[in-house]
């Protein structure tokens, strides 16, 4: 009998939340996984170590703004699939560093598409798009809070979203002009214990865990009225993979279809941890965005019908998972345990 050929995948942004979960998912599927990561003096591997997969991945140092670097990664890994998850993905930072954001989130995507066109057009390409594309879209709505799908109007309100919109259209153009199997995954917010501390959900659960243990007195946040459609990240990376297994390339929205406010996330977290939000919350204008989105709620009907994908972890369970993870980390830290983690900069943990 012939041995089944092992599929290979190249994942950019592999040290991030989505990259780590996707790598873990692909490894479980039997893939050989290559990861492109930034050339830095101390690459942050805590997520890969946390999942126990660091030694199962072949890492390739590279630069998302350098064509030669990207081409080299493709030639070296010879992938069947490429998942482009690398991004400057923090909206606030995109206002402070718009040029960096444009180069990484926009030009980097074009370089990958061009490299695929030149090296091997059989490679399947996934582009991590975002619900931020919709912004406060100027759509014809009977009410302000409508569900957004693949046909809704894009109206970005940040340099991050604008850069992602550029990438979105280039994926479509290369798909149509060069018949490359390239797709956009328009993912709404998705969280987990591996979310970065700069994101509000993880900031809430980490701060509240510290408050619960007497390590800090209050929690500072910005706009509590902001509404989002929050899902569970490990489920969303499965949707990414499913998109590249289809007979034809199409774009998909991935979302829960439920909206919740930052206040709801905060108050539920407090309830889970036995805290009172009124006693610990302090509003800080520093955490307000120059332009805030009103409400983003996704319609993933197409993904459900075509990919047979649907979210399983509900909002309350998601918050519980994150709260318990951060509380457990801080409890273990206080016991003197050393482990890969982002809240403590301890080189010995790596």
Regions found by a protein language model. Name each.
Residues 68, 135-137, 194, 264, ...:
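Activation segment
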Residues 152, 156-163, 193, 197-201, ...:
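The catalytic Tyr-centered alpha-helix of NAD(P)H-dependent dehydrogenases
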Residues 22, 28-29, 35-36, 62, ...:
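C-terminal substrate-binding subdomain of Rossmann-fold SDR/epimerase-dehydratase oxidoreductases
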Residues 101, 194, 259:
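Aromatic/pi-system hotspot detector in well-structured domains
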